[in-house]
From Swiss-Prot:
Protein name (database record): Neuroblastoma suppressor of tumorigenicity 1
Record has Amino-acid biosynthesis as a keyword: no
Similarity comment text for this entry: Belongs to the DAN family.
Region ranges (Disordered): 132-178
Low complexity: bias regions: 140-160
Predominant place of localization: secreted
Pfam families: DAN
Function: Possible candidate as a tumor suppressor gene of neuroblastoma. May play an important role in preventing cells from entering the final stage (G1/S) of the transformation process.
Localisation per UniProt entry: Secreted
GO CC list: extracellular space
């Protein structure tokens, strides 16, 4: 039984990302830093009026390094990469008005709102756990359902456009500015 437990847990421990590095021996006077900076983000969608919202962006300097390899390889490759990225975020629905579109007079966009940033392993996938807990409507919390894709009429004739799931690239975004 113990071997089964060790056999199941050991691979997970080996694949876990290493902890972020705050100092390097080669540069003892330098420290990694990462923080959330306030920005104004422009949320847009084709055929709709863009909306400015207050958000945060992650900005910082985290350590990465790569030590030259040898062939044949005698030890593991020494490569490490940390990046300044969201450590805590929530999702908010931003409703865009689409004048002249009677079938779809408004579009709901799901926008990630960054709360806190930190240096994390570069390959780490962002976590979307608790998405339903953190989704809040722009006008009044709980009064609007989130974007979803199925065909049925909505109150006021509103039919949300199908959205990509969180984490999918948002090609329609017009970007962020300071």
């Amino acid at each position: 039984m113990l071997w089964v437990l060790v056999g199941a847990v050991l691979p997970v421990m080996l694949l876990a990302a290493p902890p972020p590095i705050n100092k390097l021996a080669l540069f003892p006077d330098k420290s990694a830093w990462c923080e959330a900076k306030n920005i104004t983000q422009i949320v847009g969608h084709s055929g709709c009026e863009a909306k400015s919202i207050q958000n945060r962006a992650c900005l910082g300097q985290c350590f990465s390094y790569s030590v030259p390899n040898t062939f044949p390889q005698s030890t593991e490759s020494l490569v490490h990469c940390d990046s300044c990225m969201p450590a805590q975020s929530m999702w908010e629905i931003v409703t865009l008005e689409c004048p002249g579109h009677e079938e779809v007079p408004r579009v709901d966009k799901l926008v990630e709102k960054i709360v806190h940033c930190s240096c994390q392993a570069c390959g780490k996938e962002p976590s979307h756990e608790g998405l339903n807990v953190y989704v809040q409507g722009e006008d009044s919390p709980g009064s609007q359902p989130g974007p979803h894709s199925h065909a049925h009429p909505h109150p006021g004739g509103q039919t949300p456009e199908p959205e990509e799931p969180p984490g999918a690239p948002q090609v329609e975004e017009e970007g962020a500015e300071d």
